[in-house]
């Protein structure tokens, strides 16, 4: 149902603002496919947004802002530790291969 409403709204927008009145179905299908995908965004901005929503560093998943005794997270050169919670890393979108570098 939601997809149908979205398709109708996109068709209306394309009809209103596009110079060509036909042939927008391919663009609409691509937009809907991007919205419907279950995978979260992989950009730096998306990772930072998700990390900020749970008050974590987007690079190492440690609590951010840190406590007075936090020494391993500076937000620039930090990496996930050996005992980092995998569920947090997965939510933020930190690839586990980054840990081995």
Swiss-Prot record:
InterPro entries: Carla-bd. Disulfide bonds: none annotated. Keywords: DNA-binding, Host-virus interaction, Inhibition of host innate immune response by virus, Metal-binding, Suppressor of RNA silencing, Viral immunoevasion, Zinc, Zinc-finger. Pfam families: Carla_C4 (PF01623). GO terms for biological process: regulation of DNA-templated transcription; symbiont-mediated suppression of host innate immune response. The keyword Metal-binding applies. A zinc finger (C4-type) spans 57-78. GO terms for molecular function: DNA binding; zinc ion binding. Belongs to the carlaviruses nucleic acid-binding protein family. This is RNA silencing suppressor. The gene is TUC.
